[in-house]
């Protein structure tokens, strides 16, 4: 039985009418302080170590629950790399089952992307050297273990990955990590009475929990200086989409999406964030008034009582994050830049048109289930294609090794925050994409395109893509 559009909207929170310990601010009232993952930055050729291991974490402030993590903590450190560098990365699998890892948004050849061909058995390392040759972007690294991606990400194998370049260094945007520039990783879970995550693969559709977490805790707050605050938003949920807004109706100023800056800041009162999508926003805190980001209405009393006896997909609390300004307004504050990037001239013609239909009641893409040994799509590096992606059941669509522009959504203009290059897009009907093939892949190291609902991808809504190197 497939998840109906109405049920999905109710479950997703879209129906608005209805290596070190993380940094923390001082506790305030019943809200926990926002945990800020430690920063792991590439410097002078030194390798970056990411150890996948069992850990313990307190989601609700009580006893710690057994989880998976990276470098000893739930989720992982925020990795920062710089365009032009060659970064040596050492993944170490200290878990009891095979795992593969990838960095969504990092544009690398298929040999360096991870996935099935780079499966790490227990006790095994993988040490790729990654040439960073792309524009600044907020990416994320996570498990993409074949047929086990959903439980592995749910268990805690995920973290934020930031690419900086000369443009990002010189723009007048907040860039002090953990001070005015924060990673915000949103997930939903189902916790038992002891705060231990529960996970059962749903019979159809994706997994929805009843507890929304940000950086591993519920409804946190963070103290910020008066002025502009930069939030790097990542939806690391298995299937839930969020519609974010401010409790006082102030605006989000969107400056970047999945693969980098927008040409200019876009101002919105509501902000969508599908699974796997990233958005960078600026929030004006200069007036000194506290504000919360919310994801719709929380469960009512009857819904909460019902949730005591059966699993619920309605969020108990929809407060994402509370921003609490402190201190005095600086004597000089930067204005929001009018432009972020120079106008880009896109060269080349569309060489091919494709239609991709994501499975609904049955998983698969264009009626075919993912097969590790089959190439489903062949393209040429350095070319453009026009893809129409269709889904009857709302979900995101993600593709490795490419960047795309959203041209239309169900025949209409896309959301303003979807300007700029992306690798993940929300599909509810038909979405038209202009796809550029940045990197090559190979028969034994193909790129994967898939549903962004992790359970659907695990059940076969994925395909392998061979991108032949440019001459």
Swiss-Prot record:
One of the protein's GO biological processes: FtsZ-dependent cytokinesis
Lineage: superkingdom: Bacteria
Domain Plastocyanin-like: 229-288
GO cellular component, one term: cell division site
PROSITE patterns (alphabetical): TAT (PS51318)
Signal peptide: 1-27
Pfam families reported for this sequence: Cu-oxidase_2, Cu-oxidase_3, TAT_signal
Subcellular location per the Swiss-Prot or TrEMBL entry: Periplasm
GO molecular function terms noted in the UniProt entry: copper ion binding; oxidoreductase activity
Key words of the record: Cell cycle, Cell division, Periplasm, Signal
Post-translation changes: Predicted to be exported by the Tat system. The position of the signal peptide cleavage has not been experimentally proven.
Stored InterPro entries: Cu-oxidase-like_N (IPR011707), Cu-oxidase_C (IPR011706), Cu-oxidase_fam (IPR045087), Cupredoxin (IPR008972), FtsP (IPR026589), TAT_signal (IPR006311), TAT_signal_bac_arc (IPR019546)
The keyword Repressor belongs to this UniProt entry's keyword annotation: no
Biological role: Cell division protein that is required for growth during stress conditions. May be involved in protecting or stabilizing the divisomal assembly under conditions of stress.
Family, as annotated: Belongs to the FtsP family.
Protein name: Cell division protein FtsP
Gene name of this polypeptide: ftsP
């Amino acid at each position: 039985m497939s998840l109906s559009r109405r049920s999905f909207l109710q479950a997703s929170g879209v129906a608005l009418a209805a290596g070190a310990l993380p940094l923390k601010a001082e506790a305030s009232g019943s809200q926990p302080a926002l945990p800020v993952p430690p920063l792991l930055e590439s410097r002078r050729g030194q390798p970056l170590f990411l150890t996948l291991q069992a850990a313990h974490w307190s989601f609700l402030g009580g006893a710690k629950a057994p989880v998976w993590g990276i470098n000893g903590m739930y989720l992982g450190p925020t990795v920062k790399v710089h365009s032009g560098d060659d970064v040596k990365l050492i993944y170490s699998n200290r878990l009891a089952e095979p795992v593969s890892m990838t960095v969504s948004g990092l544009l690398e050849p298929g040999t360096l992307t991870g996935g099935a061909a780079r499966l790490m058995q227990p006790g095994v390392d993988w040490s790729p050297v990654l040439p960073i040759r792309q524009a600044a972007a907020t990416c994320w690294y996570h498990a993409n273990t074949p047929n086990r991606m959903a439980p592995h990400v749910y268990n805690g194998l995920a973290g934020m990955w930031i690419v900086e370049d000369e443009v990002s260094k010189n723009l007048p945007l907040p860039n002090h990590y953990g001070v005015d520039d924060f990673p915000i990783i949103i997930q939903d879970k189902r916790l038992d009475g002891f705060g231990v995550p529960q996970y059962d693969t749903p019979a159809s559709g994706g997994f929805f929990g009843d507890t929304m977490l940000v950086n591993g805790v519920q409804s946190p707050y963070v103290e910020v200086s008066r002025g502009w605050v930069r939030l790097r938003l990542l939806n690391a949920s298995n299937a839930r989409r969020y519609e974010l807004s401010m409790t006082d109706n102030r605006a989000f100023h969107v400056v970047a999406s999945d693969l980098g800056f927008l040409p200019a800041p876009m101002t919105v009162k509501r902000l969508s964030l599908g699974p796997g999508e990233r958005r960078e926003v600026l929030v004006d805190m200069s007036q000194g008034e506290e504000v919360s980001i919310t994801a719709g209405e929380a469960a009512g009393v009857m819904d909460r009582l019902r949730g005591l006896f059966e699993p619920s997909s309605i969020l108990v609390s929809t407060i994402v994050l509370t921003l609490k300004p402190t201190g005095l307004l600086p004597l000089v504050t930067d204005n929001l830049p009018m432009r972020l990037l120079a106008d880009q001239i896109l060269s080349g013609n569309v060489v091919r048109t494709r239609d991709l239909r994501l499975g609904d009641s049955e998983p698969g893409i264009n009626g075919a289930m993912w097969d590790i040994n089959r190439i489903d799509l062949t393209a040429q590096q350095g070319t453009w294609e026009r893809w129409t992606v269709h889904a009857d059941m709302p979900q995101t669509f993600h593709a490795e090794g490419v960047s795309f522009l959203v041209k239309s959504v169900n025949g209409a203009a896309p959301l303003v925050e979807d300007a700029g290059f992306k690798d993940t897009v929300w599909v509810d009907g038909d979405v038209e994409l202009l796809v550029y093939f940045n990197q090559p892949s190979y028969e034994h190291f193909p790129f994967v395109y898939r549903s962004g609902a992790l359970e659907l991808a695990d059940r076969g809504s994925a395909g392998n893509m061979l991108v032949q190197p440019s001459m």
